[in-house]
C-alpha cells in the first residue's frame, strides 16, 4: 500500500463514505469517546498550554538543527551496536530493507504498527519478493486479513464492528467462536504467538529516536511491539528523518502529550526504549539491529513554508476533533494519512497532480489547531495549499473562469449592486411562498451541490447598505431626541430649583 490507496476522484470517495451509515456511527462514537477522555485529562493538567508551547519549541529546535541531531542519533546508535542506513527516497528504503532480508535469508517477518512502513508500501513490496509480513497489532492484523485500508492513524480498524471481525476471521482463519472481543483476542493471540516465536526478523516503527542515547522508542497498548522488537534475532527499525528528540527529558514532555492526545489516557499499555543489540548476559533482545532513517521528501518540506508540519507526532488528535473527518470518514481522503494532518501532509509527499482537491476537504474551523499538542497551524497550512493549487494552475478552466468572473463582479460596486438587485426578485419568483430554495431547485447551476443537502433562504429585497443607512439614521435621530429631552429636563430642573 502506498500513500494514496484510492485513486478515485475526491467527490466519488466522499459519496461512498456518506452512504456508509456504520462508518458514520463508528467515527462519531470514537470521536466523542476519545475527545471526551482527552478533554478530561487535559483539564487535570494546570499548565497544559505551557506543555504544548514547550513541545512545539522542542520540535522546532530539532528541525532547525536536524542535521546535528540525526548525526548524533546515528553515531550513538552505532555505538550501541546498531547498523544505521540513510534512505533518501521510499524506493531506497525498500531496497535497503530487502538487502537485509536477503542477507539473513529470511522469508517472513512480524511487524508492529508503523505509519512509515505504510508510507513506503513495505508490505506490498515484501510480498512481491516472496516475503510474508505478518501484522501483529490487533487492528492492523484485521486490516491486513481483510485486504483493507486503514481509516485512522491510531485506530486503523475503526470501520469494523465485532460481528464483521468475527465473520472475517471465520472466513479467512477458520475462527469458530463468537463475536465477543475477548474471545476474538484470545484467538488472535493463539494465532500470532507462533509467528513471534518463529519469525527471523521483527520490523517496527519508531515513535521517537533519542539523539543523546541512540535509543528507539515504541508506544503500544497491546505489547506486540515489545515482542516484535525483542524475540526475533534481527530487528529492523524504520523511522522518518524528523522523528528525533534531543534527550530523555524532551522525550518525557512528548510522551505526556502523545498518549493523552491520541487515546485520552495518562500512559500507554506498553512503552519501550530500545538501545542497541542484545548484550552479553542479557536473556532477550535482538542480536542484530538495523535502523533505516527515511527522508522521502522531508528535507524539501523543511525548506519551505510547510515546515511546521514536521512537528507532527502522529497522535491523531486533529482527526478526532474534525467535523469533515466525522462526515467523510478516513476513507474519504483516499490516503493513509487522513484528517487535517493528512490534508496537509499527503500533497507534500505525492504532489498536487493527485491531490489538488484534497485541501478543500476542510471547513477551516480551526479546531484541529486548538487540540494539536505541538501547535501545528493546520488551517494556515491548508489555506497555503489552496493558494498553491490555484497559483500553480491545478484548477479547471471552468472553475478558474467562474472565480475570475466572481472577482470582477464583487470588486465592482455598480456590477455587484445590479446583480444583487436582480437576484432578490428572481429568487422569490423561483421559491414562491416558501422563501427558500430546496432540493426541488437542484437544477440551478453552481447552487445544486449546496441545495442537494441543505436549504438556502432567499435574498432580502432590501440591501444591507440601505438597511444599515436607515438603521444608522434612526439611531442618530434617537440620540438627538434623547439629547434634546435631556436638555429640556435639565432646564426644567434648574427652573424648579430657582422657584424653590
Model region roles, listed by residue range:
Residues 213-215, 249, 276-278, 338, ...:
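Short capping/connector residues at structural and topological boundaries
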Residues 130-135, 250-256, 289-292, 367-374, ...:
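Short secondary-structure transition/capping segments
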Residues 281-309, 324-441, 500:
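Ferredoxin-type iron-sulfur electron-transfer modules in oxidoreductases and energy-metabolism complexes
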Amino acid at each position: 500500500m502506498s500513500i494514496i490507496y484510492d485513486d478515485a476522484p475526491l467527490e466519488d470517495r466522499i459519496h461512498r463514505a456518506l452512504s456508509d451509515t456504520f462508518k458514520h456511527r463508528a467515527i462519531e462514537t470514537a470521536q466523542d469517546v476519545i475527545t471526551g477522555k482527552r478533554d478530561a485529562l487535559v483539564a487535570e493538567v494546570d499548565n497544559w498550554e505551557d506543555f504544548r508551547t514547550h513541545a512545539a519549541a522542542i520540535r522546532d529546535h530539532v528541525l532547525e538543527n536536524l542535521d546535528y541531531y540525526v548525526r548524533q542519533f546515528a553515531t550513538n546508535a552505532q555505538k550501541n551496536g546498531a547498523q544505521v542506513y540513510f534512505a533518501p527516497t521510499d524506493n531506497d528504503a525498500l531496497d535497503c530493507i530487502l538487502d537485509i532480508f536477503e542477507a539473513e535469508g529470511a522469508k517472513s517477518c512480524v511487524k508492529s504498527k508503523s505509519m512509515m512502513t505504510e508510507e513506503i508500501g513495505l508490505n506490498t513490496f515484501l510480498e512481491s519478493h516472496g516475503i510474508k509480513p505478518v501484522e501483529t497489532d490487533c487492528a492492523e492484523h484485521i486490516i491486513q486479513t481483510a485486504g483493507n485500508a486503514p481509516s485512522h492513524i491510531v485506530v486503523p480498524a475503526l470501520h469494523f464492528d465485532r460481528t464483521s471481525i468475527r465473520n472475517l476471521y471465520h472466513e479467512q482463519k477458520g475462527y469458530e467462536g463468537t463475536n465477543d472481543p475477548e474471545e476474538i483476542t484470545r484467538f488472535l493471540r493463539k494465532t500470532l504467538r507462533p509467528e513471534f516465536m518463529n519469525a527471523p526478523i521483527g520490523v517496527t516503527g519508531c515513535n521517537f529516536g533519542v539523539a543523546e542515547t541512540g535509543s528507539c522508542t515504541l508506544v503500544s497498548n497491546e505489547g506486540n511491539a515489545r515482542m516484535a522488537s525483542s524475540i526475533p534475532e534481527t530487528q529492523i527499525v524504520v523511522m522518518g528523518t524528523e522523528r528525533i528528540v534531543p534527550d530523555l527529558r524532551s522525550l518525557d514532555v512528548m510522551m505526556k502529550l502523545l498518549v493523552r492526545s491520541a487515546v485520552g489516557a495518562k500512559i500507554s499499555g506498553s512503552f519501550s526504549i530500545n538501545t542497541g543489540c542484545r548484550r552479553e548476559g542479557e536473556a532477550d533482545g535482538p542480536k542484530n539491529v538495523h535502523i533505516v532513517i527515511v527522508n522521502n521528501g522531508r528535507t524539501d518540506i523543511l525548506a519551505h513554508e510547510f515546515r511546521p508540519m514536521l512537528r507532527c507526532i502522529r497522535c491523531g488528535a486533529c482527526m478526532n476533533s474534525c467535523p469533515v473527518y466525522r462526515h467523510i470518514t478516513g476513507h474519504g481522503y483516499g490516503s493513509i494519512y487522513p484528517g487535517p494532518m493528512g490534508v496537509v501532509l499527503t500533497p507534500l509527499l505525492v504532489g498536487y497532480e493527485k491531490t489538488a482537491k484534497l485541501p478543500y476537504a476542510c471547513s477551516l474551523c480551526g479546531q484541529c489547531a486548538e487540540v494539536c499538542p505541538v501547535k501545528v497551524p493546520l488551517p494556515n497550512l491548508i489555506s497555503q495549499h489552496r493558494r498553491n493549487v490555484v497559483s500553480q494552475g491545478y484548477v479547471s478552466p471552468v472553475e478558474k473562469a467562474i472565480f475570475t468572473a466572481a472577482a470582477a463582479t464583487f470588486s465592482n460596486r455598480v456590477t455587484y449592486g445590479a446583480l444583487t438587485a436582480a437576484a432578490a426578485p428572481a429568487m422569490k419568483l423561483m421559491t414562491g411562498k416558501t422563501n427558500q430554495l430546496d432540493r426541488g431547485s437542484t437544477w440551478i447551476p453552481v447552487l445544486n451541490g449546496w441545495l442537494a443537502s441543505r436549504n438556502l433562504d432567499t435574498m432580502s429585497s432590501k440591501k444591507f447598505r440601505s438597511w444599515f443607512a436607515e438603521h444608522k439614521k434612526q439611531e442618530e435621530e434617537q440620540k438627538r431626541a434623547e439629547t434634546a429631552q435631556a436638555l429640556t429636563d435639565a432646564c426644567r430642573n434648574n427652573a424648579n430649583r430657582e422657584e424653590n
